């Protein structure tokens, strides 16, 4: 926050060292890795599966906790200013493979920062019914797909009775 408020410029990237690194995922670990490597002179490309950069910073943390345009977008811009390239809608394993990145696109190393893991299910009747969401799915629908709005493609229906299993941050 201090750096943003005082327009402190990031460290400039060193002269390129001629080595290419692929970073899979544009969440906190991917952005950190990409920025640090770029500062050391590596040519870095970040591959993001979703259409928007930021990973859990964008889809998993509500706007009131982490302002997307004030903080996240500015941080991504700072990483871009270091020379990092970004490609969205690239699902590693489907769109391309790690082998292809290394053999056909000449990346010498790959960092996998593919994000939050899959949810744990309880194995109880009804957990796969329509309207039942894991924490990650709920956050993604709300933050990225704007499902809280009725005029969007994937609205979350609002009923009078809701059951929340768990007591973590998402539940609150």
What are these regions (language model features)?
Residues 42-58:
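Glycine-rich FAD pyrophosphate-binding loop
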Residues 1-13, 142-143, 149:
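Ferredoxin-type iron-sulfur electron-transfer modules in oxidoreductases and energy-metabolism complexes
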Residues 35-36, 58-59, 122-126:
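Short amphipathic alpha-helical segments
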Residues 114-128, 132-133:
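Flavin (primarily FAD) binding-site architecture
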Residues 107-108:
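Local beta-strand N-terminus motif with an aromatic residue
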Residues 111:
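N-terminal Rossmann-like NAD(P) cofactor-binding module of classical short-chain dehydrogenase/reductase
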Residues 60-88, 127-142:
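N-terminal glycine-rich dinucleotide-binding loop that anchors FAD/FMN and/or NAD(P) in oxidoreductases
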Residues 20-47, 87-102, 114, 118-120, ...:
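Rossmann-like dinucleotide/flavin-binding elements
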């Amino acid at each position: 926050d201090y750096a943003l408020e005082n327009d402190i410029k990031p460290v400039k990237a060193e002269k390129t060292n001629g080595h290419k690194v692929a970073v899979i995922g544009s969440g906190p670990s991917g952005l950190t890795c990409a920025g640090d490597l770029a500062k050391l002179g590596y040519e870095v490309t970040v591959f993001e599966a979703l259409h928007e950069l930021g990973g859990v910073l964008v889809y998993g943390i509500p706007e009131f906790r982490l302002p997307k345009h004030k903080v996240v977008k500015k941080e991504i811009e700072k990483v871009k200013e270091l020379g990092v390239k970004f490609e969205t809608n690239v699902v590693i394993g489907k769109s391309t493979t790690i082998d292809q990145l290394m053999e056909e696109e000449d990346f010498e190393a790959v960092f996998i920062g593919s994000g939050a893991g899959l949810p744990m299910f309880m194995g109880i009747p009804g957990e796969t019914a329509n309207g039942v969401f894991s924490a990650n799915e709920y956050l993604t629908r709300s933050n990225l797909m704007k499902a809280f709005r009725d005029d969007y493609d994937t609205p979350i229906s609002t009923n009078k009775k809701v059951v929340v299993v768990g007591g973590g941050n998402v539940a609150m």
